[in-house]
Amino acid sequence: MINGSIVALITPMNSDGSVDFASLERLVEFHIDQGTDAIVAVGTTGESATLPMNEHVTVVAQTVKFAAGRIPVIGGNGANATSEAIELTKSLSKVGVAAMLGVTPYYNKPTPKGLVAHYKAVAASTDIPQILYNVPGRTAVDMKPETVAELVGVSNIIGVKEATGDVSRVKRLRELCGNDFMLYSGDDATAREFLLLGGNGVISVANNIVPKAFKAMCDAALAGNAELAASIDEPLRGLYTTLFCEANPIPVKWAAHRMGLIECGHIRLPLTELSEQCHGLLLDAMTRAQIEVK
């Protein structure tokens, strides 16, 4: 099972909006070098909403190729049409991903019954492990622990990314879903507590730019060392907040560019590059987190 420090990887782009595969390869090498436990390719932070399906699959496939078996790659396979999610899932099943991460269908606001039917249909289209993804702040639907529990019996649904920031759900999910069901935090600000309460890992935005420290925090929390985890986590807390001064992944792409991790901080419309009033805030947070800016 995949656990620990997982990066929700950005998708680097050139100034013309095309994917910058050279920078993508460098990012994969960077995370392998820094000890990151796994990569999520083309999730929310990877701009899945603005990559058409063929490009989406290509980026995931190239990430798998660059990883070359040295780090697991989880491919984003969410869509708000079940038929589209199934088509994407079938394509990703051919490129070597270790698992897939499927966000709840967004905008059309399915009922709990609809969520269960959606995820069962997607899971039935592949043998690859599936991770559910609950982020109501983006999707306008909240998949409650009771709904997640209805999917535990599906053999290749292995866990959930819970991004509400409500750490009380860790206990409830564990009670309903059992000890073998993987629980991943999707909220950096509450990730430490999530792990200390029994979570298995974190799918993180901040991990793009502080992977070594974030890995150390996760390892300490998973080992039950609350004091060490807190000492690592506290200097990063300003960063967790400031990386959401505008919609993710606008700030983290800007930060990665300032660090020299990617050649360009370009982001696809309708998102636009980081506004100037956020520059100083983010630079201050990066300084406090001991990030070197080029």
Curated annotation (Swiss-Prot):
Q: In which pathway does it act?
A: Amino-acid biosynthesis; L-lysine biosynthesis via DAP pathway; (S)-tetrahydrodipicolinate from L-aspartate: step 3/4
One matching Pfam family is: DHDPS
Cell compartments where the protein resides: Cytoplasm
Q: Which SMART domains match?
A: DHDPS
Q: Where is this site: Part of a proton relay during catalysis?
A: 44, 107
* Protein family according to the UniProt entry: Belongs to the DapA family.
Q: What is this protein called?
A: 4-hydroxy-tetrahydrodipicolinate synthase
Q: What is the source species?
A: Shewanella sp. (strain MR-4)
